[in-house]
Regions:
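Surface-exposed, low-hydrophobicity beta-strand/loop segments enriched in small/polar/acidic residues
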Residues: 1-115
Length: 115
């Protein structure tokens, strides 16, 4: 046997060591997921690993179809500095998906198709 089908895979099980809020971006080595609900520390929850999400972004232009990366230390247009943001810069960041639409540098989010 080479493989056994488990499930569709839109979400994965996740048990955080500290509490996670709905909408938080979570990186597990090279896999980016987004919490769809609050998850208490040490409690089983799930992360979306596919779908389309509005993600806080760095102040930059991102073109539809561009690869989008998660910068864990990024400064979002409308969020807390250093709390993380989506970016088109690959260096030192984790691939999360592709931009669905053009994003202006002044937009607070980029619409991302998770991959």
């Amino acid at each position: 046997m080479q493989a056994t089908y488990i499930k569709v895979g839109r979400e994965i099980d996740y048990t955080p060591s500290s509490a996670v809020s709905a909408g938080d971006v979570v990186v597990q080595v090279n896999l980016v997921g987004i919490a769809t609900e609050d998850i208490a520390a040490s409690a089983l929850g799930s992360l979306a690993v596919s779908g389309i999400f509005d993600v806080d972004q760095n102040a930059e232009i991102i073109v539809a179809g561009d690869a989008v990366y998660w910068d864990a230390d990024g400064n979002s247009v409308s969020g807390t500095a250093g709390a993380g943001a989506a970016t088109a810069t690959a260096t030192d960041n984790t691939f999360m998906g592709y931009a669905q639409a053009l994003t202006a540098a002044t937009d607070s989010y980029v619409r991302v198709v998770l991959r």
